[in-house]
Amino acid sequence: MDLEADPWRVNSEENGNNISGSVWEPDNSSVNALKSYSADSLQQEANKRVNDDYLGVNIFSNGDNIVRGTASNVYQNDVLWDRPNIGSTTQETDIRGVNRFQATDTPQYAANDEYKNWVESVRKTYFPLAEDIVSVEEIPEREGLVFKHTNYLVKHLTPLPNTDPSDDRTVVRRYSDFDWLQDVLLRKYPFRMVPELPPKKIGSQNADPLFLAKRRKGLSRFINLVMKHPVLRSDDLVLTFLTVPTDLSGWRKQAHYDTTDEFTDKHISSSFMNLWRKEFSEQWNKADERIDIALDTWVKVTVLIERYEKRMKQVAHERKLLGQILNAIPDTTEALYPQSTATVSQINEGVGLIVEHLNSCADVIERENEEVDSGLSVRFKAFIDVIIALKGLFERYKMMAGNNIPQLQRRVEINQERLNTLESNPDVKGAEYDRVKQSISRDKRSILDQMNRSWLIRECILEEFTIFHETQFLITDCFQRWIEINLRYTNNNVDNWEKICKKLRDMPLQRH
């Protein structure tokens, strides 16, 4: 049993109805005992939470605290705005206007109607506060001869375009199917905010109900974030994942599906190039510089909110325990005060009311915990998921968005000089001349292709950063819901105490 989740062992099978003191003592000797956090221990818990709960995320290496870093400037060093004049290499391309483009250091885009219209059109495609439309439930029966695995019942709650789902809109999927879906999305959309998966982990943890519950919630957040994304939700393989009723692993072996990235055969539009400003890249660098700090902060917030709810759950258990103990008072008072039957009867009646009150207070706390666990925690964690998705996008940009345009440009210049020399030499062979000319042509085409891809990547990241701005309202939503829940159940609790206070006024304080 996880003693951190249940340090009083209230859910232990050994408890039953046994209310002996030894069972209910907190396990203070254990390192998992629930105790107050220091700044360092909270940091360690936050580090562990991120590295345990997400695949491929290791931002807190060696458990070090997050400190303010320096901007990587990977976006500011992009050759497309540091070297805008590529000479004649743009004359044979569909990318019109590249040789005229010049980045500006003034925030002209703020007053640019074209940019505003573009941003508005992108924002309207993303609704992070929308209700989840996919449910993921664990199927109790596990499959597998040697290594048992868990299956999940995945159900989409709304119709999906261009699909022919089963009547109940459900499919059975296992963890490896989710892993496959994330893999193909990263292949096709490397510069989109593809969410992270919870860890798989095998062995004893695969039978741990707490781990399995956490993983199921993580899978649910993953697929719902995918379905809220304006591009990912329309992908054919996402729709296949949600609607093909057969075993997906068998389908993958037989089917032919495309995983080439989204930029294949796509050309950048001149309208986007005209609205681009260098300030965008500076904003990305600042966001990239601070994203680990933001992630660290939100993990700590979530840890502390969940920690508070755990404490309140223990309070609820102890109030029920106190009620059970108080039930023994009437028998003892009748034996202790045999000559005061009238007043003892009133006292016993009051004790019975206190027992009812304690159970009512415990029920209020349990309902609050259930609402926080099912509705509030998932929203705090979904915001963490979004931050991690943006961080992953930035990391993939650093690894995958490079180009060798400067080297190719230099080679074109050298070969052009060589070609001019060959043209002025009548003794040179035609084969050598043709070889140099073809090399120049290939390099120019490669420059154009890489420029086009770099511009498409830039457009893609700006789209993602624009829709990411809509997630700011998740912050408001999380805290408004948290405060509303606390206020509502605090009022319920106050009402209970006011009622018991009025009822106990008739308990005797002295003989009449």
Swiss-Prot record:
Q: Where does a 1,2-diacyl-sn-glycero-3-phospho-(1D-myo-inositol-3-phosphate) bind?
A: R174, S176, K200, R215
Lipid bilayer topology? Peripheral membrane protein
Job of this protein: Required for vacuolar protein sorting.
Any Pfam family hit: Snx8_BAR_dom
Q: Where is this region: Disordered?
A: 1-24
What's the encoding gene here?
MVP1
According to its record, what is known about the domains? The PX domain binds phosphatidylinositol 3-phosphate which is necessary for peripheral membrane localization.
Q: Which GO terms describe its cellular component?
A: cytosol; endosome; membrane
The UniProt keywords, alphabetically, are:
Cytoplasm, Membrane, Protein transport, Transport
User: What is stated as this protein's family in its record?
Assistant: Belongs to the sorting nexin family.
Q: What is this protein called?
A: Sorting nexin MVP1
Q: Which residues form the PX domain?
A: 130-248
From the Swiss-Prot or TrEMBL record, state where the protein is found: Cytoplasm; Membrane
Q: Which domain of life is it from?
A: Eukaryota
Q: Which GO terms describe its biological process?
A: protein targeting to vacuole; retrograde transport, endosome to Golgi
Organism lineage: Eukaryota, Fungi, Dikarya, Ascomycota, Saccharomycotina
Q: Does the record carry Endoplasmic reticulum as a key word?
A: no
Biased composition (Low complexity) is annotated at: 13-22
Where is this protein chiefly located? cytoplasm
Q: What GO terms are given for molecular function?
A: phosphatidylinositol-3-phosphate binding
